[in-house]
């Protein structure tokens, strides 16, 4: 466990608040995550559970969460820590994303993921949310005008446009 993770990069800004609510000397455990979920009070019924404490039902990962509210969360694991962090920071977005997976399953004619679930998985694992209030900047982004967006308009970042890490696999 590295308690200094939160200060090591601005990438962690959206989830940095967790560092003030988790033990400094050890990995957070399922009880810590559940206490934070209750503190957030946005998605009732979500719990973080060790995978070995869940019966093997043969369900997709997302189906289990949708049906039971139990998010499989391995102990002492950065990937699952960051997944829990995103659930705790953006609970309504994660719930909506989980619902997209369920819709994708219902509209798929095979056991494969399909395009809707593929897109949901990409956002969940490696997504960046770009929030903006200046349409010109959004247009520069869409047109891949990187020099204009990132260099000429650098002063706008953090003021009228922001990139927020959402995908837990890229933290």
Regions from the PLM with identified roles:
Residues 21, 36-39, 64, 85, ...:
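Residues that form generic nucleotide/phosphate-binding pockets
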Residues 50-51, 84, 132-133:
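Short His-Asn-centered micro-motif
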Residues 10-21, 80-92, 121-125:
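Short, hydrophobic/amphipathic alpha-helical patches that form generic packing surfaces
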Residues 59, 76-84, 117-120, 135:
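Non-catalytic, well-ordered alpha-helical scaffold segments
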Residues 69-107:
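Hydrophobic alpha-helical segments and helix pairs
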Residues 103-171:
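A contiguous, surface-oriented mixed alpha/beta subdomain in the mid-to-C-terminal portion of proteins
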Residues 54, 88-92, 129, 147:
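Short loop/turn segments at secondary-structure transitions that flank enzyme active sites
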Residues 1-68, 159-171:
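The feature captures two recurrent sequence modes
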